[in-house]
A protein has these predicted regions:
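Short, surface-exposed coil-to-beta transition loops
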Residues: 84-87, 102-104, 122-129
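A solvent-exposed, acidic/Ser-Thr-rich amphipathic alpha-helical stretch
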Residues: 43-95, 121
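A short hydrophobic beta-strand element
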Residues: 96-111, 126
Length: 158
C-alpha cells in the first residue's frame, strides 16, 4: 500500500513538472507576440525572445530578425493602430534542451490605408505556424518560426 501511495505521489509530481516544462516554451512564444505588438514595438528586449541566429519564414521569404524588423519598418508598422494575435490548438513537443510548437494563429490588424489617407483598414488572417525553440541558459528562445497564411481578409473601416 505504501509503495502504491509513493508511486501515485511521484507520478503526480512528474505530471506537474511536465506541465510546468511545457508551459515554458509557450510563455516564450506568447512573450514574443506581446513584444511584437504595436503597443510594445520596437521592444527593447526582443533578444529575450529570439536567438541571435533567429530565422522566420513569412510570405515565402526567409528573414533574420534584422531583416524582419526592416520589413516592418517598410510597412510603416510604427503607424499601425492595433495588432492582436490569438493562438490556439497548440501542440508542444519537448526534447532535452529544445521544444517545438505547432499552432493556429488568428491575427487582426488595424492600420492606415497606404493608398487612401485618412482611411483605416482591418486585416484578419489565419496562419498555421510552427516554432522551434532552444533552451539557452534556462530560457527558451525562438530559433525558427514558419508561418503559412491560410486566409486573409482586408476591409475598410467606416
Amino acid at each position: 500500500m505504501l509503495v502504491l501511495l509513493i508511486s501515485l505521489v511521484l507520478s503526480s509530481v512528474t505530471r506537474a513538472e511536465q506541465m510546468t516544462t511545457r508551459d515554458a516554451p509557450m510563455a516564450t512564444l506568447l512573450g514574443f507576440f506581446d513584444a511584437l505588438s504595436v503597443e510594445n514595438y520596437p521592444h527593447s528586449n526582443m533578444q529575450d525572445w529570439v536567438t541571435d541566429d533567429f530565422l522566420i519564414f513569412e510570405m515565402g521569404q526567409a528573414f533574420s530578425w534584422d531583416d524582419f524588423a526592416a520589413f516592418l519598418a517598410e510597412a510603416s508598422y510604427d503607424t499601425w493602430v492595433s495588432t492582436e494575435w490569438r493562438l490556439s490548438e497548440a501542440r508542444v513537443s519537448l526534447t532535452e534542451g529544445a521544444a517545438h510548437i505547432s499552432y493556429v494563429n488568428r491575427g487582426e490588424f488595424v492600420y492606415p490605408d497606404p493608398d487612401n489617407p485618412g482611411q483605416q483598414l482591418k486585416e484578419s488572417n489565419m496562419w498555421l505556424e510552427s516554432v522551434y525553440l532552444i533552451n539557452e541558459e534556462g530560457q527558451f528562445r525562438i530559433k525558427f518560426l514558419q508561418s503559412d497564411n491560410v486566409s486573409r481578409v482586408v476591409e475598410s473601416l467606416p
